[in-house]
Amino acid sequence: MEKIIEESKQGGSLILENKPENTKKLFIESYGCAMNFSDSEIVASILSGNGYNTTNVLEEADLVLVNTCSIRDKAEQTIRKRLEKYNAVKRINPKMKVGVLGCMAERLKDKFLEEEKIVDLVVGPDAYKDLPNLLNEVEEGRDAINVILSKDETYGDISPVRLMSNGITALVAITRGCDNMCTFCVVPFTRGRERSREPQSIMAEIQDLWHKGFKEITLLGQNVDSYLWYGGGLKKDFTNASEIQKATAVDFDQLLEMVAVGFPKMRIRFSTSNPQDMHESILHVMAKHSNICKHIHLPVQSGSNRILKEMNRLHTREEYMILIDKIRAIIPNASISQDMIAGFPTETEEDHQDTISLMQYVKYNFGYMYSYSERPGTLAGRKMKDDVSDEIKARRLQEIVDLQQKHAWWRSEDFIGQTVEVLVEKVSKKSTEEFSGRNSQSITVVFPKEHYKIGDFVNVKIKSCTSGTLKGEAVGYSEMN
């Protein structure tokens, strides 16, 4: 599984509209990837129906929940510091309960509850519907835990509230879990095996968002392009499905087509893709429909075949390059972004140079780059020595970052003189006189407000750029308005 960590969103307290009949207060923070933020919306919806309104004031909360990430050691250390803060407040307000959700819950359940005694409940990603029962256990003075992984839970029957929402963009989860056993990743062990959500429940959720005025959705999954609905159950069991189930199964390109046709004025994104599942049929659907954004996040992790094999990635360097060529041929204006790990165990300078040369070949629009962080419970953590020094990791990572910066500038400059369609999402951070949004390629665009408003689709002529931002002037509304 690939996880995009948006640093600007980490740790925000999440708020939804209060119900007057609710008397208890929930403080919930989320860390990690978009799936964690989507899960927090599900949790808030469940607890809203069980007497809880949300608050962004920690000290007044009856219940504090933190949705956790285990992808890197830095993320876990951040969450541990937050737990220390919660417990400091709890010493002043002993009635306050503290719970851990998400990926750290399964991995560190015993440590949190029994050894360190810093939380009252621990709830895994597939057990959120059990929260009301677990809270009853806590109220009766018992620690509560449920980290059982499910074969079929997709939360398709839960209508998520939209936390920290701008009312314009929303996440729609379509798969859960992961069947790819990448040696560096904890996700298959913390989120379970892959299963997909029923298509009609997805369409119903998008319909609800459309009626509420949302303009853009992101179809979300650990491996979104391997979506496969055949009546329920794990994807790995599809081979045992009946002939009728196989004949009526819906895969990702079919779902993408359904959404694009069903909501022609809704902008559609998806994340995250795995190279081995990004089939030509998906690319043709993307090219066919103008409301499907022309951006593909396509993690590669390394440009070295030897390291890819050590990582148990299900593609080679050559297969990845062929896929890049297909994307360029079928969707010439597509942007492509990457995940890259520097300093994986046994990585040599030659392996690193293979990564550099792959980046030179693709010239990504942007990327998410990290030095290797050994994660307990992964195959790499158990079987491989973390033998690349921190100094070498840092140097290689910086070389990757510097090259990506160069390519991002080059790609951004290509937009100068073009007119691009932008969905206005918010006021610019740098100037209250400017709006900020993204174009189809997921590049941030900033332009003067004039008479436009948040939620408008605006055509913007690009005048200048930085490596990560396009700057221009509005020339009118787009056809999507």
UniProtKB/Swiss-Prot annotation:
[4Fe-4S] cluster 2 binds at residues 178, 182, 185. Its EC number is 2.8.4.3. Its cofactor is [4Fe-4S] cluster. Pfam families: Radical_SAM, TRAM, UPF0004. It catalyses: N(6)-dimethylallyladenosine(37) in tRNA + (sulfur carrier)-SH + AH2 + 2 S-adenosyl-L-methionine = 2-methylsulfanyl-N(6)-dimethylallyladenosine(37) in tRNA + (sulfur carrier)-H + 5'-deoxyadenosine + L-methionine + A + S-adenosyl-L-homocysteine + 2 H(+). Keywords: 4Fe-4S, Cytoplasm, Iron, Iron-sulfur, Metal-binding, S-adenosyl-L-methionine, Transferase, tRNA processing. Monomer. This is tRNA-2-methylthio-N(6)-dimethylallyladenosine synthase. It comes from Flavobacterium psychrophilum (strain ATCC 49511 / DSM 21280 / CIP 103535 / JIP02/86). The gene is miaB.
